[in-house]
């Protein structure tokens, strides 16, 4: 995936695909987002429902402009081909690039909404 542009987005997406995140089991991806916020000196809050809010101060000179809010969900649809052994609770997604298309080997990719999270992390980086 190193050849895909913009690199920062695809690097974040790949990292997210390596974190098991079935519905109702988002703790690992939640921890990843929290660590990302800390690493980038951003305010990160998790509410009682498990939603993660990461805030970034305005760029200098834009403090009085309207706020922008980006949203994505953390879990993924967990489906696999009948001939594939994969545990969505523990196994990372096997990502492949095929003629410029990003795919998963025998499972769902988790692009809904992993790519949304990746784009937001790129904006926050």
Where are these regions (language model features)?
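Mixed-charge, polar/low-complexity N-terminal
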Residues: 3-5, 33, 77, 83-84
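N-terminal capping segment at the start of a domain
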Residues: 1-24
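A non-catalytic alpha/beta surface segment that caps or lines the substrate-entry region
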Residues: 22-66
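Structural signal for hydrophobic packing residues in well-ordered secondary-structure cores
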Residues: 14-17, 37, 41, 78
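Active-site metal-coordination/substrate-binding segment of hydrolases
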Residues: 62-125
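Predominant activation on well-ordered alpha-helical scaffold segments within soluble catalytic domains
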Residues: 10, 14, 34, 117-124
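Short glycine-centered, acidic/aromatic-flanked micro-motifs in structured strand/loop junctions
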Residues: 19-21, 56, 72, 106
């Amino acid at each position: 995936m190193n050849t895909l542009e913009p690199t920062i987005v695809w690097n974040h997406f790949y990292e997210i695909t390596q974190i098991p995140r079935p519905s109702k089991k988002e703790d690992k991806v939640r921890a990843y987002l929290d660590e990302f916020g800390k690493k980038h000196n951003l305010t990160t809050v998790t509410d009682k429902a498990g939603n993660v809010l990461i805030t970034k101060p305005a760029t200098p000179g834009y403090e009085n402009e309207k706020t922008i809010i980006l949203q994505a969900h953390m879990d993924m649809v967990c489906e696999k081909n009948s001939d594939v052994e994969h545990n969505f609770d523990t196994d990372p997604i096997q990502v492949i690039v095929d003629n410029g298309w990003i795919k998963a080997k025998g499972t769902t990719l988790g692009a809904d909404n992993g790519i949304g999270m990746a784009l937001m992390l790129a904006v926050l980086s």
